[in-house]
């Protein structure tokens, strides 16, 4: 199969890269084993977005694509971002939030001294979001007036998981029954908290399981029925917002006609000649392209491999009497550095802090191979970090695979910005008749 650009990985960075490359006019193939780390994603874009033209353009592109996909995100009016309530009950700051969560900005809610406040709603069949615990932590950490109530979802759920409950919320008949129950349980005729002079909270937080597809209609119906703003909490794994994102963005990209997904496929071979990747392949098919985006995730996503022994290289320091002091633990240097398995890229990072590891790249995100790895995955592995050399001319790294630093670990903002830029550069390179890399397209 032949494409202009092949994206390896379909997590957040991979999807943004595919959308960006397609917007640049490229015919794009996406190869992935799964939806990447989206199943672990809270749904929020956290971390400092930073400044600069690239960041502004990337975030605008993300917001516009989300609107077209039917999964709108909101950017906070305040420069500091949204202050949202995490499932732990503590505050979490986000630069971007899905429409389903953005109404939960804590700065718009009254404090404990100001009457009605936030109601945390829980479901008795869903143990991942215990309303009483979340409310107690929120009162302690935010200073807001917070109460809680729980309601049952009925026998249809049993003790189901988040995905099972989300599918139930897509059932229109069942949801109408849930609306009636929510009115009775969450909005009582008498004051909903002792000492308050109103029966209605300022806002209600729900677990983020209000449907895989009908969530926007459900939130609107709940807000109208309950008479106050309603929002979802940031997600815990398995993430329903992450599943929504993958489904809605994939559908939009496929419907636009420039992106083809090869899901459930694992790249196991690469063909590199003269510093350029010519093809990648799974067990059955070879995919050729003029440019490639590598968005396979870091150590957690399988984009970097680490020897199991590296996770257990922990010892106790000897005390003054020569015995091991169990209160003075230290981490030995990792016996093996993380290895990038597809191109045998030269990697760097800070000891056993795996979030800091990633391939060495130039300023455009093009990675360097290790010495002796010119033949790609079919060449013999080198034994140590290779000398610096020219980067692969038509491969761009994006997302968590880039790694982070002690001060800033990888986050969703990094995935969005790096994915947008990698896709843009790959499309620009693929459009050149001679296939040679040009400068950053402006």
Where are these regions (language model features)?
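N-terminal Rossmann-like FAD-binding beta1-loop-alpha1 element of flavoenzymes
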Residues: 3-30
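A conserved FAD-binding loop/helix module that cradles the flavin
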Residues: 19-20, 302-308, 392-394, 398-433
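Helical element adjacent to the flavin cofactor pocket in flavoenzyme catalytic cores
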Residues: 135-140, 175-200, 204, 211-268
């Amino acid at each position: 199969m032949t494409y202009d650009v092949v994206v390896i990985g379909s997590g957040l960075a991979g999807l943004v890269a595919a959308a960006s490359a397609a917007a640049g006019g490229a015919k794009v193939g996406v190869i992935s084993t799964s939806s990447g780390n989206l199943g672990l994603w809270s749904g929020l874009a956290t971390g400092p977005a930073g400044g600069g033209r690239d960041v502004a353009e990337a975030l605008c592109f993300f917001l516009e694509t989300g609107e077209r996909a039917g999964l709108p995100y909101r950017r906070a009016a305040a420069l500091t971002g949204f202050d949202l309530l995490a499932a732990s009950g503590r505050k979490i700051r986000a630069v971007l939030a899905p429409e389903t969560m953005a109404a939960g900005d804590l700065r718009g809610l009254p404090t404990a001294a100001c009457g009605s406040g936030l109601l945390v709603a829980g479901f008795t069949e869903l143990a991942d979001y215990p309303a009483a615990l979340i409310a107690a932590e929120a009162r302690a950490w935010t200073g807001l007036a917070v109460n809680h109530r729980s309601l049952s979802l009925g026998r249809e759920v049993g003790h189901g998981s988040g995905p099972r409950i989300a599918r139930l919320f897509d059932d229109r008949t069942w949801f109408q029954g849930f609306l009636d129950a929510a009115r009775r349980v969450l909005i009582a005729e008498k004051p909903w908290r002792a000492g308050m002079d109103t029966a209605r909270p300022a806002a209600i937080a729900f677990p983020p399981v209000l449907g895989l597809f009908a969530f926007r209609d459900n939130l609107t119906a709940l807000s109208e029925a309950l008479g106050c703003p309603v929002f979802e909490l940031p997600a815990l794994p398995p993430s329903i917002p992450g599943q929504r994102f993958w489904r809605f963005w994939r559908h939009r990209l496929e419907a636009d006609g420039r992106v083809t997904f090869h899901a459930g496929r694992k790249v196991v071979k690469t063909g590199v000649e003269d510093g350029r990747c010519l093809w990648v392949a799974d067990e059955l098919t070879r995919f050729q392209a003029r440019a490639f985006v590598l968005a396979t995730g870091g150590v957690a996503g399988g984009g970097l491999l680490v020897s199991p022994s590296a996770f257990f290289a922990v010892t106790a320091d000897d005390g003054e009497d020569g015995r091991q002091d169990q209160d003075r633990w230290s981490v030995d240097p990792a016996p093996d550095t993380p290895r990038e398995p597809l191109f045998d890229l030269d990697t760097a990072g800070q000891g056993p802090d795996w979030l800091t590891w990633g391939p060495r790249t130039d300023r455009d995100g093009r990675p360097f191979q290790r010495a002796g790895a010119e033949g790609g995955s079919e060449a013999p592995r080198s034994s140590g970090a290779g000398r610096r050399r020219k980067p692969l001319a038509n491969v761009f790294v994006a997302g968590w695979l880039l790694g982070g630093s002690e001060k800033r670990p990888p986050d969703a903002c990094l995935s969005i910005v790096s994915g947008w830029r990698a896709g843009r550069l790959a499309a620009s390179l693929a459009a050149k008749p001679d296939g040679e890399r040009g400068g950053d397209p402006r």
